[in-house]
Amino acid sequence: MGLHLTVPGLRRDGRGVQSNSHDTSSKTTADISRCPQHTDAGLQRAATPGISRLLGISSRSVTLTKPRSATRGNSRYHWVPAAAGWTVGVIATLSLLASVSPLIRWIIKVPREFINDYLFNFPDTNFAWSFVLALLAAALTARKRIAWLVLLANMVLAAVVNAAEIAAGGNTAAESFGENLGFAVHVVAIVVLVLGYREFWAKVRRGALFRAAAVWLAGAVVGIVASWGLVELFPGSLAPDERLGYAANRVVGFALADPDLFTGRPHVFLNAIFGLFGAFALIGAAIVLFLSQRADNALTGEDESAIRGLLDLYGKDDSLGYFATRRDKSVVFASSGRACITYRVEVGVCLASGDPVGDHRAWPQAVDAWLRLCQTYGWAPGVMGASSQGAQTYREAGLTALELGDEAILRPADFKLSGPEMRGVRQAVTRARRAGLTVRIRRHRDIAEDEMAQTITRADSWRDTETERGFSMALGRLGDPADSDCLLVEAIDPHNQVLAMLSLVPWGTTGVSLDLMRRSPQSPNGTIELMVSELALHAESLGITRISLNFAVFRAAFEQGAQLGAGPVARLWRGLLVFFSRWWQLETLYRSNMKYQPEWVPRYACYEDARVIPRVGVASVIAEGFLVLPFSRRNRVHTGHHPAVPERLAATGLLHHDGSAPDVSGLRQVGLTNGDGVERRLPEQVRVRFDKLEKLRSSGIDAFPVGRPPSHTVAQALAADHQASVSVSGRIMRIRNYGGVLFAQLRDWSGEMQVLLDNSRLDQGCAADFNAATDLGDLVEMTGHMGASKTGTPSLIVSGWRLIGKCLRPLPNKWKGLLDPEARVRTRYLDLAVNAESRALITARSSVLRAVRETLFAKGFVEVETPILQQLHGGATARPFVTHINTYSMDLFLRIAPELYLKRLCVGGVERVFELGRAFRNEGVDFSHNPEFTLLEAYQAHAGYLEWIDGCRELIQNAAQAANGAPIAMRPRTDKGSDGTRHHLEPVDISGIWPVRTVHDAISEALGERIDADTGLTTLRKLCDAAGVPYRTQWDAGAVVLELYEHLVECRTEQPTFYIDFPTSVSPLTRPHRSKRGVAERWDLVAWGIELGTAYSELTDPVEQRRRLQEQSLLAAGGDPEAMELDEDFLQAMEYAMPPTGGLGMGIDRVVMLITGRSIRETLPFPLAKPH
């Protein structure tokens, strides 16, 4: 099925495109074929991949998507308008054919006479009636209510006539059959039409009936007089006294009078002419009668004010949003007022301008309101310039989306004139600068009135069309006080004369969108490039982070059709576009934008049915100003008279009659309570707490006051003397109310205590006031003296209290707490508030970090900080995280280890140095791994890896002592007994000396066969096969040994053990062993299957270090994402000589895991959680 679409030039102002002429026009026509391969699998799919590759068409060339749901057809009588329209349309077609063809008239004579006599008016050879029936059929199909009324009246009148004939009697059997059949058909038709009344919802203009009658009467009079004159000139055999009556019968009587009533007849050709006169009169009358309501196409001040408010609140994402304030549009709002759609009505098409404006959550409501408006007046819905998100919303409402082209977006942070791809722009800018041009950039508010008037005059004089073009991507005005935030860019020659200008509208608060581009005939080549480049290069000082340029229609077709190996269809499609570009600048627009290396953002057109595509195309051409109809109001000042804003929004008094933006804070407050299904929905318990907060505020109580330090913590208060005066602050965890006495549990970081509120002890108020004002979870400040309850429980006897923080959400169940591990991670703040174990883990982690630092400080180590953002990833073999710095336009890596920078410090003479900080590795997340973790790296000059065995053990034992009070580690245990499975933590003594074993000895013991550093690769592979250990064929012997170690030794280790002397090939930063060949001086510390740390005798030979890093860089170049890159700066530093050094690396998170017996997710305050 072919779709022929006429598309207007969707861009701001193409006349500013650099070309051989100083001014250009914009018009784009395209012919698109919809193939059966097109599916509705999404906005980016155009054809099956196989066909696309075969023909050379990309899925971005043309995108057609089917709607997910229809907007009509839910009623059981939805078929009535179409059935009525088709029935009347068939009769109209046959009547028209019979009017021009005697043969067809002879063939259908019998059924035509039967239908005409008993069912429906079907006269012989009457153009007028044929056209009237055609217009009636079209109006019925369009669900026009006036058409329903006309058809119903016809059926009622015909039924009455048939009933009268039946009642009169005296008819032949054939006539009686026809009259009875006709009466039955009429009754059924009347019943169906009455039942289908609600399906005819489209309104017509007010007073359409009287206007239609006047048009018909005037046309009929003119037609009768003209026909009478023709009969007098060419009477044929018609009697002179019957000529006027014959002409009137043919023109306005639908030839209802039998031709045999007249004496003689004129030539048959005159009958056709008379019918045309009648047809013209009736067509004009029918058009006026069935014409849809015409929109005012104008915004009121309140409408514009509301749109500006929505843009301030939600307009940061839509580059075309500001164009919604164009005043020759109408607007329809969602009932909540949180979103709206601006549109124009042309040739019966309601053409929406881009995306809805406002809250994305309210877009569907705005689209529904717009579609209901279209249905009410019988308009065909259409959309021009929708974004991907907007097109998806329209699609879900039942429309079909078609990709038109791409919008060019510049990111000033990435823009630069250097580089081969910017050569053309750079040369053009150089030419303009040599011509003495400079650029001036100002906001419209900074331009004086007289100067702005000159600017408007220049813009009009440099325009080569009589009317200002644009609709969805143009503002249509310049110098309006309401547009003070718009940006004006001017090119000025050495004589201070303006030679070109760009006007850009706001795009949120940090962007601008091109509206107007004009240049003088005397401007040199490169003027536009100079202005765009200067704007991009100085954008930061203007607070601009994004610039929207022109729109390139069918951009993907130009790009893909020019590619090497493009298919025949792609090349043919591009060739057609290039051909039409001679008139409509399609390729010029694409190339003028492409040279800036922009980001291309697709834009879509949407329509309801393929049959209305030509109408949507014509409407868009008219709206964009490429086709100016007679009596067009395009150049008039557009001021609406009937605001479209919802009553609830208008009643707030926030909107301004002059169209200026309303108070945004006021809109937020209104939006919180007036949402239409998009307001913040709160659970019942939360709503109750919010209501209590409002009551407190209305009573003058500040629920979130300024703090003041308490005199005691809870623990200190419990240890204080009896009757001691104290003030404590904490969270209410439990309340027990006994009337005049109230007990509450108060918790702070140090512990939990009971507070007692007795009416007789309170300085003011009563316990009931406390109970009414507070909820579980509230933060309160209590003042009183220490005492005891009747049961002897130490308690704070409260004399005064103050609410210092209202908890607006209920705490978890006080008995079960947070059971879901994911919930505990995502709401760690809540976990800490209710879970004593979580607070203990935070304290233990702090104790471990403090103990590690104090141990190193005691040995004379210096703590430093090295860069987290690094230009190369090195120091370890791991996959890094990559980010980007805009200033230098280069990628950076989050460090995987600080090693190489710490060694630079060692070269500089820092003999004992450590860093305790964050490292990042883009690897798995499990029990012992988190992408972001805390790492300790320490280096000691004049030492080796053996010295760090004692140093590492001391660090961990001291950390355990600080966290647990003794050198013990907590191990999770599971005991199965008669009462079920019980999980608990068991302390394990880690004091004393820990075992030390070589890697090869440990593997040999696990295999039951001796291996060493000289064992060949083939033997190692056989041992792997026998043990079921996987390996890669490109690995050397050292990598295979490491894999055996990880599978057979590391994961089976229980007590803390040092494994020493790893193969050299897997230790690129480690010096070779001083006495053993093939191994390096490195050890790993393992406990209960987890590696805790590693230490090296650092490689200080710069020549050997370079060789090993070059091997690593080759692996990286070969695609290994974990291999280290060659760091020339580090190697150069090493060439200045680094003292013999021993280095330690230890995972602090895993040490905390060892000491506390918890997983890494439990010991980290905020581990990485999966997205919701």
From Swiss-Prot:
Which residues hold Mg(2+) 1? D1084, E1091
A GO BP entry is: lipid metabolic process
Tell me the DNA-binding residue spans: 726-804
Q: Where is this region: Disordered?
A: 1-34
Provide the cofactor note recorded for this chain's UniProt entry.
Binds 3 Mg(2+) ions per subunit.
Q: What is its main location?
A: membrane
Q: Where in the cell is it found?
A: Cell membrane
Look up and give the membrane topology term. Multi-pass membrane protein
Quote the protein name from its UniProt record: Lysylphosphatidylglycerol biosynthesis bifunctional protein LysX
Provide the species name.
Mycobacterium bovis (strain ATCC BAA-935 / AF2122/97)
Taxonomy-wise, where does this protein's organism fall, top ranks first? Answer: Bacteria, Bacillati, Actinomycetota, Actinomycetes, Mycobacteriales
